[in-house]
């Protein structure tokens, strides 16, 4: 029976739509990963940091769920495939860290510094990233339901990665994410999933959204100056009081506003 499992999964993936396939891949081990208990303490991690004497530490594949790692200097750390579900990383410095295929479900990363972090295949559903700095990072993974209010995502590299095919055509998943007031200036979110995302008053200046799904998203008051909306799905999206709309190339031709909500109903 166990031998049949991979075949059954493969048949499901072949029958599923592209974004459903990604959900299956990212969620396949969610249950077991979420239940893994921490194998280290905060003191253990602090000891590793002290011993490294300023060099990046290796926490790859470690079970760190629920740990309080708030405020720690984890700059450049290797956290690849680490399990940090419900961990407290508030204010931690994860700049340049390797977070590929790591688990951060319901983790607190508010105010954390993630500049230039590698996040290919990351799972951070329902995580708190409010006020975090993800500038120049590569969050090609699953952030469904996360809180990114007030976060800085300047020069984000979240577009679909067509070069790395090890996990299929991955893309940034920001479904139902709170990006209210977030700074996404110059971010690459091509082919990303942003259904029902809250982008109220967000700065989308020069953002690449080509081929993305913004259906049901709220862009009220957002600055879209210079943004690329080519082949973007805006079905039922709220495009009210947009700023910089006149500078968007071929706005009327590229954006099907007839499918969007462009004014407040009485």
Regions found by a protein language model. Give the residues of each.
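Tandem repeat scaffolds
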Residues: 19-266
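Bacterial N-terminal signal peptides
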Residues: 5-15
């Amino acid at each position: 029976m166990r031998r049949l499992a991979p075949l059954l999964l493969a048949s499901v993936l072949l029958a599923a739509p592209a974004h459903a396939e990604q959900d299956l891949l990212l969620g396949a081990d969610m249950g077991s990963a979420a239940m893994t208990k921490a194998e280290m303490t905060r003191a253990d991690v602090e000891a590793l940091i002290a011993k490294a004497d300023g060099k990046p530490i290796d926490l790859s594949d470690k079970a760190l769920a629920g740990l309080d790692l708030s405020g720690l200097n984890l700059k450049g750390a290797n956290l690849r495939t680490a399990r940090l579900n419900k961990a407290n990383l508030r204010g931690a410095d994860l700049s340049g860290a390797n977070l590929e295929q790591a688990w951060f479900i319901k983790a607190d990363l508010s105010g954390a510094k993630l500049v230039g972090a590698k996040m290919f295949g990351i799972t951070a559903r329902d995580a708190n990233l409010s006020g975090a700095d993800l500038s120049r990072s590569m969050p090609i993974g699953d952030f469904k339901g996360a809180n990114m209010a007030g976060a800085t995502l300047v020069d984000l590299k979240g577009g679909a990665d067509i070069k790395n095919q090890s996990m299929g055509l991955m893309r940034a998943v920001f479904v139902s994410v709170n990006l209210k007031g977030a700074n996404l200036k110059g971010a690459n979110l091509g082919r990303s999933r942003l259904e029902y995302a809250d982008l109220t008053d967000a700065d989308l200046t020069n953002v690449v959204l080509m081929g993305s799904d913004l259906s049901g998203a709220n862009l009220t008051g957002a600055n879209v100056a210079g943004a690329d909306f080519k082949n973007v799905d805006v079905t039922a999206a709220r495009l009210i009081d947009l700023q910089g709309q006149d500078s968007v190339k071929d706005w009327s031709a590229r954006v099907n506003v007839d499918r969007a909500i462009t004014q407040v109903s009485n």
